[in-house]
């Protein structure tokens, strides 16, 4: 099932499967989100919950039981309940059933996804609450994919990622099969822009920590057209694209948690998390994106 809202600048469609934004068009009817070509990458803008990245050995343990889990959690792969689709807002909710708790994640939670259009801005708020009787630990992040080039008259080299100030981001190394190795390095020093090339992501994503910038966007250099994410307050921001040449899309991914590391314990309660909610607790985060095109 899908729901659509629009204003004078943007039209947004969200699918209840994964609570995923599957289309975002500007006033000219141009598609801004990647359209999930399965030959390249089959998703549009998945929600990452209740973990980000990979689990060590593809599993975790809790209460003496082992739970198998794929990359980026399971919220992106299950049906969410549509609560509201009117005016400028779409809102959905995910609550675990007994099968989900038995097979995937043995905790009670409520994950609410709220999409709101505001002029040329899309605000996507994820709220997690704990209705259960025990602590809820979780990871969470965003993974929107934006089509590039913006039109047929431009090529990949006409684009760059741009911070709002010069940056020397610390890159967390995940060369251990997608797991953090505990090493870090500098790929760029005192740079405000990162040139997009067809080989930029040959070694997968860049997970950046310690950013001071408020925004990170993808810019068309000759026109100034852009898609800009407000990444302030997120401890980690990734950039990524699939191994397709030429590059067909780029992802700007603000995360509140990290993948597992090569030496992580298997016990869920010993894993680093975005938040640890006591019974009755609530936590939220918002990604705001401005579409200047």
Question: What is each stretch, according to the model?
Answer:
Residues 14, 126-132, 241:
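Asparagine-centered strand-capping/turn motif at beta-strand->loop junctions
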Residues 44-50, 262-270:
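Short, structured beta-strand/loop micro-motifs enriched in basic residues and often containing a Trp
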Residues 8-66:
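Acidic-aromatic substrate-binding/catalytic surfaces of carbohydrate-active enzymes
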């Amino acid at each position: 099932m899908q729901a659509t809202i629009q204003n004078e600048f943007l039209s947004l469609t969200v699918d209840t499967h994964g609570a995923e934004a599957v289309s975002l068009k500007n006033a000219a009817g141009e598609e801004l989100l990647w359209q999930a070509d399965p030959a390249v990458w089959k998703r549009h803008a998945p929600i990452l919950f209740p973990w980000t990245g990979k689990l060590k050995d593809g599993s975790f343990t809790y209460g003496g039981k082992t739970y198998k889990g794929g990359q980026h959690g399971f919220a992106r792969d299950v049906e969410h309940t549509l609560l509201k689709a009117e005016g400028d807002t779409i809102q959905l909710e995910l609550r675990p059933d007994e099968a989900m708790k038995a097979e995937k994640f043995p905790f009670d939670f409520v994950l609410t996804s709220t999409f709101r259009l505001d002029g040329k801005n899309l605000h996507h708020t994820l709220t997690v609450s704990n209705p259960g009787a025990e602590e809820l630990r979780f990871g969470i992040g965003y993974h929107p994919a934006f089509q590039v080039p913006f039109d047929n008259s431009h090529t990949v080299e006409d684009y760059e990622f741009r911070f709002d100030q010069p940056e020397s981001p610390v890159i967390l190394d995940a060369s251990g099969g997608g797991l953090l190795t505990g090493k870090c390095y500098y790929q760029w020093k005192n740079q405000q822009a990162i040139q997009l090339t067809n080989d930029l992501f040959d070694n997968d994503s860049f997970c950046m920590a310690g950013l001071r910038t408020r925004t990170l966007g993808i810019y068309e250099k000759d026109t100034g057209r852009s898609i800009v994410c407000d990444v302030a307050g997120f401890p980690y921001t990734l950039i990524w694209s699939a191994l397709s040449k030429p590059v067909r899309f780029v992802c700007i991914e603000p995360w509140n948690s990290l993948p597992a590391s090569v030496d992580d314990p298997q016990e869920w309660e010993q894993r680093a998390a975005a938040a640890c909610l006591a019974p009755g607790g609530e936590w939220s985060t918002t990604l705001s994106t401005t579409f200047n095109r």
